[in-house]
Amino acid sequence: MNPILSSSSSATNDSVLSPTPIDLINPTIKTMKRFYSKHSTRTYKWRVQQVKAMLTMLTSNMSLFQAALLTDLGKCSVEAQLTEITTMVLECKEVLQKLASWMRSEDVGSPLLLAPAFLEIRFEPRGVCLVIGPFNYPVTLTLGPVISALAAGNPVVIKPSDLCPAVANLLTKLIPTYFDPEVVNVVNGAIPETTELMRNEWGLVFFTGSERVGKIIAGQAAATMSPVVLELGGKSPLIICEDIPEMKAMCNRIIWGKSINAGQTCVAPDYVLCHEKNAEEVLREMKNSLEVMFR
């Protein structure tokens, strides 16, 4: 039995998150690295099995994911399905459809001096990966990178957001049902647990969150020479040109993009720049859109 998972699933209340004991983190990572060193994750068959397991986990537990998202974020079932669950189901299906072609080596031209040798680009797994998920899309932005890592032949440690305990507890309960402990593990907690995770060398660290924390993660990853991907926040301005024939439709789309997921989307419209002659109309149409959507 995976010691991390068994210790993390002790919470009886979905709104309470039990941190993973610090002393269990490193032994589990070492076990996963030993498994990876056997090279069994490189095959097409293994990768497909893992993605299919993720797909089954999602489709068989949709109501549980919806309930967890409602508990953590107050997200209704329709929005949960649209922005979190269905997107991951579709991602799994796309990976299964295209994985064989993604795994093919690419032939490249070789200089005459190297003949009869030939050159090719091979796409290799990176090793055991760490995915640190955010609070705003705790399913999509956590499991999305996990799906990619598994498809690329990498075991994964998942660190869900401690701000979404219901989703974290659900993942802790479901993951060992669908994945071997050497393949996917869940580590729960906050700063101490994340700090302990970052003391290890990783094949890749994928972090989604704020710029402030991203700088910390990047610094910790540099200490072990672990490659890191940072998906951070930013600015998403909108520019409204002087002559817009469909002002009402445009404002509806702006308000929808700003209000979906309570505005907690990294590419949500941030601010609007418009010609002064359109300012009053833009404000009026946006107010109307808000009233229609939320009355």
Language model region names:
Residues 1-120:
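N-terminal Rossmann-like NAD(P)+-binding subdomain of aldehyde/semialdehyde dehydrogenases
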Residues 2, 37-56, 192-217, 267-295:
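Aldehyde/semialdehyde dehydrogenase
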Residues 16-19, 212-295:
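ALDH superfamily catalytic-core signature
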Residues 108-116, 186-189, 253-254:
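Short gly/ser/thr-rich secondary-structure transition/capping motifs
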Residues 110-178, 182, 225:
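Conserved small-residue-rich beta-alpha loop and adjacent elements
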Residues 154, 159-161, 188, 208-209, ...:
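Short beta->alpha connector loops at strand-helix junctions that form conserved
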Residues 169-176, 191-204, 212-223, 239-245:
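Active-site pre-lysine segment of PLP-dependent enzymes
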Residues 185, 208, 231-233:
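Short beta-strand segments
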